[in-house]
Regions:
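Active-site beta->alpha loop and helix N-cap motifs at the rims of alpha/beta catalytic domains
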Residues: 2-3, 14-132, 142-146
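Proline-centered loop/turn at the N-terminus of a beta-strand
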Residues: 17, 75-77, 136, 197-199, ...
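Catalytic alpha/beta core domains of metabolic enzymes, predominantly
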Residues: 111, 116-250
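Hydrophobic anchor at the beta1->P-loop junction of P-loop NTPases
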Residues: 258
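P-loop (Walker A) phosphate-binding loop of NTP-binding proteins
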Residues: 261
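ATP-binding Walker
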Residues: 264
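Walker A/P-loop
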Residues: 267
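Conserved substrate/cofactor phosphate-moiety recognition/catalytic segment
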Residues: 271-298
């Protein structure tokens, strides 16, 4: 089992922790959302600074000071998601570098999200400076329009580990059930090959199941919706906790039936539940056809 300590929290690939984002656009919104998020009792909080109305370090630091007063000792991820990876704002590489390093030096965030794969030209030095400042790094990579191949998923996660990321995160957008499987199998393979813990997810409704099967894929963190969602497909923290809290041993003597229209993801969810619980997966349509053995028309 992989483990990494973040603040007072132990992350492990056998027990995914739940992170809730704060996406306020100004000081008052950030504080208001923070108070509501704290009431949800998340394991981790993420502040999406790209939603914030300023990128000046003095204003960001003042915001972090006030935010820390509200969230107390809950571990904090500082994230400025760039527009190139689905974020709210453009920022130059130099400004992105300086912002992340300066935030790390404040000591107000335990984890700094670094888009390590797409910014590999500056990532190595940035990660080294963040580590020197005493913070840990989530190396991240996001694909909002596609799902890369399984091989690319593995290669991307391993590259971010080589760049020095303490945790390696990848989020992709599926267009079909096969895309979700690529993410699941790619995550499992990467987790077996890597030393660093991983965080992976397939976004949108189609990929929602990947947010709750971290015990299978190896993800140490899953993201749930706060006051507002920060990515497609996020469930509420209550929904995520209810599913993650299922004891697989308690349901092995029961059956689960998936009912829905064609193309709604029944097969994908059934397969994922099968991975998690060890229960056999039966395609009822195929089963009925086999049992009926309808003869060809004469």
């Amino acid at each position: 089992m992989k483990q990494i300590k973040v603040g007072n929290l132990e992350l492990s690939d056998g027990h995914p922790k739940v992170c809730v984002p704060i996406v306020g656009e100004n000081h008052d919104e950030v504080i208001e959302q923070a108070k509501k998020v704290v009431e949800m009792n998340p394991d981790i909080i993420e502040w999406r600074c790209d939603f914030f109305d300023s990128v000046y370090i003095d204003e960001v630091e003042n915001m972090l000071i006030d935010l820390r007063e509200v969230i107390k000792d809950i571990p904090l991820i500082f994230t400025f998601r760039t527009d190139g990876e689905g974020g709210e704002k453009f920022i130059s590489n130099n400004s992105y570098y300086d912002l992340n390093v300066q935030v790390a030096k404040t000591g107000l965030a335990e984890l700094i999200d670094v888009e390590a794969y797409s910014k590999d030209s500056i990532a190595l030095d940035m990660i080294e400076e963040i580590h020197t400042a005493g913070a840990k790094v989530i190396g991240s990579n996001h694909h909002f329009n596609e799902t890369p191949t399984r091989e690319k998923i593995v290669e991307t996660l391993m590259t971010m580990e080589e760049l020095g990321a303490d945790i390696c995160k990848m989020a992709v957008m599926p267009s079909c059930e096969e895309d979700v499987k690529e993410l699941v199998y790619g995550s499992i393979e990467a987790n077996e090959k890597m030393i660093a813990p991983i965080v992976t997810m397939s976004m949108g409704e189609l990929g929602a199941v990947t947010r709750v099967c971290g015990k299978t894929t190896g993800s140490v963190i899953t993201f749930a919706a706060g006051v507002n969602t920060s990515a497609p497909g996020q469930m509420t923290i209550k929904q995520v906790r209810n599913i993650l809290g299922i004891n697989c041993d308690d349901i092995k003597d029961k059956n689960i039936f998936m009912i829905g229209f064609m193309g709604t993801g029944k097969t994908t969810i059934s397969n994922a539940l099968g991975y998690i619980t060890g229960m056999p997966v039966v395609d009822i349509d195929k089963y009925i056809e086999e049992q009926e053995k309808v003869p060809d028309e004469v």
